């Protein structure tokens, strides 16, 4: 957990990534929005949260995907768009890298829909 010395702008960035994970954020966009140098954002975010802002965003998207995969019948294409991927292929690749199985396999194993 970040210490009390964590700069407030980093907590703000993390909150924005949590709430707006479907938006195609990049370091450039974060720099524009928060008026902090992107290299500083990358360095300090990683320092306090133990992963880069983009890795954090990806993890948040995967978490949302897992919820949608197990609680809805939405197609993979639909889910990938909803959580912010520009293509289902990128989503599937990202999901598999994170979870070691495809979204379809994850759904088969963990679906809460009977």
Question: Each predicted region: which residue ranges?
Answer:
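Basic/polar phosphate-binding segments, predominantly the helix-turn-helix DNA-binding elements
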Residues: 23-60, 80-105
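A short, Lys/Arg-enriched amphipathic alpha-helix from helix-turn-helix/homeodomain DNA-binding modules
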Residues: 1-25, 31-36, 56-74
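Intrinsically disordered, low-complexity basic tails/linkers immediately adjacent to helix-turn-helix/homeobox/MYB/SANT
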Residues: 112-114
């Amino acid at each position: 957990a970040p210490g009390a010395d964590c700069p407030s702008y980093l907590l703000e960035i993390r909150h924005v990534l949590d709430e707006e994970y479907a938006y195609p954020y990049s370091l450039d966009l974060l720099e524009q929005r928060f008026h902090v140098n992107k290299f500083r954002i990358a360095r300090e975010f990683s320092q306090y949260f133990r992963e880069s802002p983009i890795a954090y965003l990806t993890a948040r998207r995967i978490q949302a995907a897992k919820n949608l995969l197990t609680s809805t019948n939405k197609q993979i294409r639909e889910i990938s768009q909803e959580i912010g991927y520009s293509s289902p292929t990128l989503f599937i690749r990202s999901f598999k890298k994170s979870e070691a199985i495809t979204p379809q396999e994850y759904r088969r194993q963990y679906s809460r829909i009977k």
